[in-house]
Amino acid sequence: MFFRPAWYRPASRQVEDTDQINFWAYDSLMHLSAPSDTSLGAHAARIGVFGGTFDPPHIGHLVTAINVRFELNLDRVLMVVANEPWQKVGSRRLSSAADRFAMVQAAVSAEEGIEASDVELQRGGPSYTVDTLANLHAVQPNCELFLILGGDAAAGLESWERPEELAKLCRIIVVDRPGVVSEVPSDFSVERVSVPRLEVSSTDLRARAATHAPLQHLVPEPVISLISQLGLYGDAQ
C-alpha cells in the first residue's frame, strides 16, 4: 500500500460551475485564503507568483523563491504548478500534474511564506500565466502580484498569451544569471533581483534519479522520498 505523507493533498477535482464557487472557502483552488484583520494588516497583500513545471522541484527553485520574497518584502510566494505548460508540449513526457504538485507541496512544507498552488490544475487545459494572474486577482482583488521569471523567459514575454493584459496584472521580477542582463520588452514594469545562483537543473536531476545517483542537497529530502514512493524518473523521462 502506498503511504502518503501528512502534508500530501492531491489536487481537487475540476469544478464545473465556477460561478458558484465561494473563493474564500474553496482554498485549494488558489492556495490563497482571505486575509484576517490582523494577518496582513491594512496593506494590500504582496504576492509573488513563481510558475513552473517543477519536474522535479529543486533547491534552486527554493533559493529563488525565498530570496525574492526577502528582497521584495513579499507576504508570500506561490509556486504555481503548470497543468499543461504550452511551451513544453511535445518536448518530452511530463510527470503528471498531480505528482508535480505533490512534489512542490513536499518541497515547501517547511518553508515559511512559500506555498504550493494548484490554480492551474484546477482550471485545467493549457497553462497561460495571464489567466492565472486574473484568477488570483479575482480571489484577492487588492493584492499586488509580482511575476518571478528567469531572464530567458522574461525576454520572450511578447510571445506569451495576451501580453498586453499580462502587463497590466503584475510587476515582472527578473532573476538573471550572473553577468547576464536580459532585455525585457518595454511594455512591462520590471524589477531585477539578484539571488544566489545554483547550477542545478531539473533535466540533470531526472537523469540522476534514473541512474539512482544521489539527489541529497540538490532536491529537498521530502521530495526525494516522494520520487522514490511514486516511482518517478525510472526511465529518465
Show where each model-derived region lies.
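Extreme N-terminal basic, low-complexity initiation segments
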Residues: 1-9, 13
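Short Gly/Ser/Thr- and charged-rich N-terminal loops/segments
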Residues: 13-14, 58
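Nucleotidyltransferase catalytic core that binds NTPs
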Residues: 8, 19-237
